[in-house]
From Swiss-Prot:
This is Diphthine synthase. S-adenosyl-L-methionine-dependent methyltransferase that catalyzes the trimethylation of the amino group of the modified target histidine residue in translation elongation factor 2 (EF-2), to form an intermediate called diphthine. The three successive methylation reactions represent the second step of diphthamide biosynthesis. It comes from Methanococcus aeolicus (strain ATCC BAA-1280 / DSM 17508 / OCM 812 / Nankai-3). Its EC number is 2.1.1.98. It comes from the Archaea. The lineage of its organism: Archaea, Methanobacteriati, Methanobacteriota, Methanomada group, Methanococci.
Length: 257
């Protein structure tokens, strides 16, 4: 049996009782933290909560050893952990599919993810369009996909959730400030007037913690704002319902007129 379990968003206290229960019965526990990471805890605290040692796999090992992991679950109970919800990343969906193809039982233990946590802004979840990711630019690599997604969602009046790059192996997490700078550079290149320094966005920091920060304001005002520790994400708002306008006013910190 293979158990795909989510650890939630922030710390070991997000772990569900069901996940703890299955962990105690598991023969072996693996985890990956390259698609998302819990910034409010440590591996040691998670192990203490689960009562088992965890083997951490990097991106290469997960992608290259998926078959090995699945074969191991033919006669053992193998748990595979990730931050957030286990079925958000395509890698985990692939594991579930391949296991099912081989007749292996698959148990999925859902958990809070950024897709549910952005509700703390008061924006209505059904009004979000396609999600996009902003990555650190590199030499000969500067994807403009986020710009295109914001553009298309905006045409339909949808909100856009922008996830920010995580390089856990380098302990490097893109800040909202860096993400906004990337988007402004793409705008400067494309010049399609999709966004500018007067565009209002929402920044969410440390969603899932007891003290998340939600800030609503113009990009120009947010560029130098200190949002604190990661993880951050950015939301471009679409057409706002009056209740959403009230939510942004009262639930978020407003820094622009």
């Amino acid at each position: 049996m293979i158990i795909l379990a989510g650890l939630g968003l922030y710390d070991e206290k997000d772990t569900t009782l069901k996940t703890v229960e299955f962990a105690k019965k598991a023969d072996k526990i693996y985890a990956e933290f390259y698609t998302a990471i819990l910034t409010g805890t440590t591996i040691e605290k998670i192990e203490e909560t689960l009562g088992k040692e965890i083997t951490i796999l990097d991106r290469e090992k997960v992608e290259l050893e998926t078959e090995k992991l699945i074969n191991e679950s033919k006669d053992k109970d193998i748990m595979f952990l990730t931050a957030g919800d286990p079925m958000v990343a395509t890698t985990h969906i692939d594991i579930a599919i391949e296991a099912k193809k081989k007749g292996i039982e698959v148990i999925i233990l859902n958990a809070p993810s950024i897709y549910s946590a952005i509700g703390i802004t008061g924006l209505q979840l059904y009004k979000f369009g396609k999600t996009t990711s902003i990555v650190f630019p590199e030499p000969n690599y500067f994807p403009e996909t986020p710009y295109d997604v914001i553009k298309e969602n905006s045409k339909m009046g949808y909100h856009t959730l922008c996830l920010l790059d995580i390089q856990a192996h380098n302990t490097r997490f893109m800040t909202a400030n860096e993400g906004l700078e990337v988007l402004l550079k793409i705008e400067e290149k494309r010049n399609e007037n999709i966004l500018n320094k007067d565009t209002k966005v929402v920044v969410v920091a440390r969603a899932g913690s007891l003290k998340p920060k939600m800030v609503y304001g113009k990009i120009g005002d947010l560029l130098e704002y200190d949002f604190g520790a990661p993880l951050h994400c950015i939301i471009f708002t679409g057409n706002l319902h009056f209740m959403e306008e009230d939510a942004l006013k009262y639930l978020c910190e407003n820094i622009s007129e």
